[in-house]
């Protein structure tokens, strides 16, 4: 009997025939049992007829599209956009008009069923990937907090399924290079292990005009050790330990109107991530029970020339040490027409963060003292005793939570009805220390020679603690109908709630410290009075949770004996308190802030097509349309109702056409052309800065002999220019331009002993 566990939950809401973008299917690209993978725990292994919108990217596509990081997935799925800018800390993801540049992500991610709680670690070096699932729409019922935009599930190749050695090496202009090596071995029928490593390097593509050095160079690497043990016929254990390291210098940001990157202070990002996860499964005839226990530790340091000018304005450092543990217990079973899944999830995360801001002489003058020194009505001139000022902020952030969730599914012939429920509790606390120790002198502007009339030391040592907690009920409802067609097809409708937790704007503490310092200065000046109202720290740095309701209808249609597969989805999203990143007004503000818009809405459509008339030809395409606008949003000065939500593209497009033919009895040549596109997107709430729609073509030729593949490729061969990012700092506008034309060679070696 066939049992279907519906995405009643926001978990695998995939559209039908799990869209796959591979141009050529080979026997060893993925490993199936009866046509169905057996690695997923929270969702039905066969996602092809589930009542949700999703894209599955299989191993062959991962390699042919050179997916070695999260950013390369962008546009492969409709309305799924990951801009390529900044460093690996960025990991901004936008789905259906929902996204996040700072703090909590709007899209969750798991690797081999283990959740990543910090989006700082999302963009890691990928290697030996079996498949990637991109689920669109709220997945909060199964996957919990911060998945209101969707969920990414990544599954790696396992040593029980594949034995042998794999080598991947790629080199391109820049120069850039990437390599991975893996060994998979089964010691006996019950025990298998794999060891893999990878590294990458790039010298970047653009020079910093200030020092004539390339900006944006990077290097990194990773190790992974997986052990699989079949303890008994019904009990198995899987443990994976992984380490990733990345180091990047510079940021390729340039002043709007300029043709050059031109800043003077050091910029870099360094990150170490270690994780270990143990999964234990117990399978019986009536139910299965799984336990997933994980630990993750992140150490990183981001240092920026925050003004990105050849001036000594100010630099910012954000360095964290974070440890997190998670525990998920999942039970699922079936009785007749009834299928069910239930679980308990808990997590705890402890973060220590240093976030000092250092003002240089230009920053002191233009952001602080010029306010007084250039005011003719004030007879005094200020001068700090040191050429720099350190504003030091230290934080200890503790976050924990627990959730219970359940989904039920009833199968009435062709009709399927599902209900998912989740109760999620989270608590968070922030201990902060904001300190500054400096001194200044005041001089009469008319005094000759200048003689100080006042010398004042400023010592600030503010300490405090903030805390909050959130309790959220997250339901989802689905109904689907299996069409009477030979190729599996279905119609579905779903209603689900999305939820993203609230938090604190840590970067705004430097703004608060500046205000405190200016208050101290004003109170010391004769005839001047500082504001007597205290600064409400909680009011300034806190932001509320974001909530949404997603209404969706879709269809999964298979035609021509499965040679044509089409997925269609229409959706409407009602959002309350949408979290958006803004830049405080003025030419003296230095930070970014996450704030809540009152109300917004998003609606759109998605289309995926795969057509394979013969094994020679393969055509795939995906298109997404999003119309996301504010319904109510005032920032105190302006009313943005009716404006587009920033950073989310209105259109995404991907298309590929591949042709394969054999040469002799052993070689196969594949010619592939593809196109990615996105836009229009607005860069701010005022909608006065934007990037029009752009399209980037790529091409590749692959020679495949089974155990060896050689590919020649070129990305962006038209040299299309466009902006990948925009931001404002101290009244200036900056942007990052896209990478230029890239080309290179990739070698793949497969020594598959399990096929012998």
Question: Regions from the language model: what does each represent?
Answer:
Residues 70-73, 92-97, 110, 134, ...:
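N-terminal periplasmic accessory domains that precede
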Residues 71, 75-114:
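Extracytoplasmic beta-strand/coil segments of soluble accessory domains associated
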Residues 112-138:
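Short acidic/polar hinge/loop motifs at secondary-structure boundaries
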Residues 164-166, 171-202, 206, 210-248, ...:
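Transmembrane beta-barrel wall of Gram-negative outer-membrane proteins
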Residues 207-210, 251-262, 307-314, 356-392, ...:
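Solvent-exposed loop segments that connect transmembrane elements
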Residues 279-304, 490-496, 507, 513-595, ...:
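Membrane-embedded beta-barrel scaffold of Gram-negative outer-membrane proteins
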Residues 337-341, 347, 411-415, 425-426, ...:
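Gram-negative outer-membrane beta-barrel transporters
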Residues 341, 351, 499, 675-684, ...:
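C-terminal beta-signal and adjacent terminal beta-strands/loops
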